[in-house]
From Swiss-Prot:
It is an enzyme of class 2 (transferase). Its EC number is 2.7.7.6. It is found in: Cytoplasm. GO terms for molecular function: DNA binding; DNA-directed RNA polymerase activity; zinc ion binding. Its cofactor is Zn(2+). This is DNA-directed RNA polymerase subunit Rpo10. HAMAP family: RNApol_arch_Rpo10. It comes from the Archaea. Zn(2+) binds at residues 7, 10, 45-46. The keyword Zinc applies. It comes from Natronomonas pharaonis (strain ATCC 35678 / DSM 2160 / CIP 103997 / JCM 8858 / NBRC 14720 / NCIMB 2260 / Gabara). The gene is rpo10. One of its GO terms (cellular component) is cytoplasm.
Amino acid sequence: MMVPVRCFTCGTVVGEHWGEFKERAREGDEDPAEVLDELGVERACCRRMLVSHKDLVDIVSPYQ
């Protein structure tokens, strides 16, 4: 669905990193771990918020 704004576990703001993470890591240009390191996302709970996010808007929207 929508990109999470805050980490579910610790509450740190992670939404601000989504755009750059998606551009650099999701398209296969760079290793996701290196991108997160460069963005300053250090905690494992915050990293999983970005790595595991799946945008389902296109799949869910026909049912609304």
